[in-house]
């Protein structure tokens, strides 16, 4: 995908199917009456059959080990449970690129570990993962490249994972911001 591809309005549908965004605040992403309906919403918009939708919902619930939440109201869940449901709602769409905005904010250590393990699984499965985070230590095992941005939102420095690991002064400055 490049700028020319994105300029063509007919390509918008393709982009929506290929890229999934998980918001920092899960409350703004969740709006259905049950977790099952939340997970079914995206695939339903793609025009999939109910059989395929149910299969995706059940597979994703199992992948994230949240089958017990299936009939719960999303707004009544804990912060960590909401984050998993928000991620699951995107995974049911099976995008090739996943954008995570501050995936660890406000989560207990238990849910932070669960999210890290999930990100590692998704990476192993071949998904492209882009993470905006101030918690580098938690994502160090996942990332292949680190981009540092200025206050003007421009890239100031780009490191490969190996370069990043060889610059402890930059890591220290970044992880103490």
Q: What residues fall within each predicted segment?
A:
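Conserved ABC ATPase "signature" region
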Residues: 51-69
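H-loop/switch region of ABC-family ATPase nucleotide-binding domains
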Residues: 133-134
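Conserved beta-strand-loop-alpha-helix hinge in the C-terminal portion
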Residues: 153-175
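Hydrophobic anchor residue at the start of the ABC signature
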Residues: 87
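ABC ATPase NBD Q-loop/coupling interface
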Residues: 1-14
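Conserved ABC ATPase signature
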Residues: 73-77, 81
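Catalytic Walker B motif of ABC-type/P-loop ATPase nucleotide-binding domains
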Residues: 98-101
């Amino acid at each position: 995908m490049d700028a020319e591809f994105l300029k063509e309005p007919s390509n918008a549908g393709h982009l929506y199917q290929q890229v999934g965004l998980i918001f920092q605040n899960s409350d703004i992403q969740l709006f259905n009456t049950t977790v099952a309906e939340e997970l079914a919403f995206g695939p339903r918009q793609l025009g999939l059959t109910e059989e395929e939708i149910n299969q995706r919902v059940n597979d994703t619930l199992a992948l994230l080990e949240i089958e017990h939440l299936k009939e719960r109201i999303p707004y009544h869940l804990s912060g960590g449970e909401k984050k998993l449901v928000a991620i699951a709602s995107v995974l049911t769409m099976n995008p090739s690129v996943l954008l995570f905005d501050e995936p660890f904010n406000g989560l207990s250590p238990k849910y932070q570990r669960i999210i890290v393990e999930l990100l590692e699984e998704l990476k192993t499965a071949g998904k492209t993962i882009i993470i905006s985070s101030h918690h580098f230590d938690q994502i160090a095992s996942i990332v292949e490249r680190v981009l540092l941005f200025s206050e003007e939102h421009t890239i100031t420095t780009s490191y490969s994972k190996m370069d990043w690991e060889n610059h402890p002064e930059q890591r220290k400055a970044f992880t103490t911001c």
